[in-house]
C-alpha cells in the first residue's frame, strides 16, 4: 500500500540512496510511521504539503475500505462521507459539510503536546489525542446527518437524549463500552453512579430538564472541568452521562428497534417516557 504511494525523486530529502548516480526513493511509509508512532508534526506537515496526492489516497480511498462503511449496515440511507485531512491552525477539530468530513490532524497530536499544554485547559486536552479521532469524526458527522429538527425550541432533555443517542450508536457500532466512547474516567463514572439520583431529582425539581436556556444547556453538556450548580467537586458533562443511561434503558426495553430507527427518532419526551428510566427506581 505504502510502496505504491512512494515516488521517484532526484531531490535528496528523506530518501534511500540506491547509488551515487542513481535515483532516490522517497519513503512515504517512514513519514506515516513517524506521524503515527511519534506524533511528529513535521511529518504531518510534509505529508500534506509535499505529498498531498499520496496522503489524499491514503485518507480518502485506502482508509475508506474499513470501518467507515459500517454505518450503512445499521441504516442503508446513511451517506458515506468524502473524507479529507487538513492543518487547521488549531481551529475546529472536525469540519462537516454536505457529505464531506474534514479532520484537522493538528488537533490530535496528544494531550501532552507542548503547544496544547500552553494554550488549553486539562479538560480540553483530554480529547486532543489520536485515540479520539474516530469518535469525534463519527459524532460530528452523525449529528450533521441526523440533526435535531429546527421547527421547535429544544430543551436540555432534547440535548441530553440526542447526545446520548449519537454516542450510544457509536459505542454500539465500535463494540466498546459507553464509558469508553464518552471518555469517562473511572473516577467520573463512580461519581455519576453515586449521585445519579440526586442530580436527576435536582434537574426535575428545578425545571431545568425542560429548560431551553442555552447557558444551562452548555453547563450540563460541554466539557468544562466541573458543574457548579451541582457542587464544586462535581464533574462535567453530567448531561451526557444521563443521556447515555436514558438511551441504554430505551434500547434494552425495545430490542426490536434498529439503529437506523433510533437515529431517525427525535421525540425525546417519548423516548424518556418509554425508557422506564428513573434513577431512584432503578437503584431499588
Predicted regions: what they are:
Residues 2-5:
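C-terminal motif of bacterial Sec signal peptides marking the signal peptidase cleavage site
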Residues 7-69:
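N-terminal mature-domain "stem" immediately C-terminal to a signal peptide or N-terminal signal-anchor/transmembrane
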Residues 67-70, 168, 202, 242, ...:
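Amphipathic alpha-helical segments that form well-ordered structural scaffolds
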Residues 71-79, 173, 177, 203, ...:
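Sec/Tat-exported extracytoplasmic proteins
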Residues 164-227:
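Acidic/His/Gly-enriched intrinsically disordered linker/tail segments
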Residues 211-284:
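C-terminal soluble interaction/assembly domains
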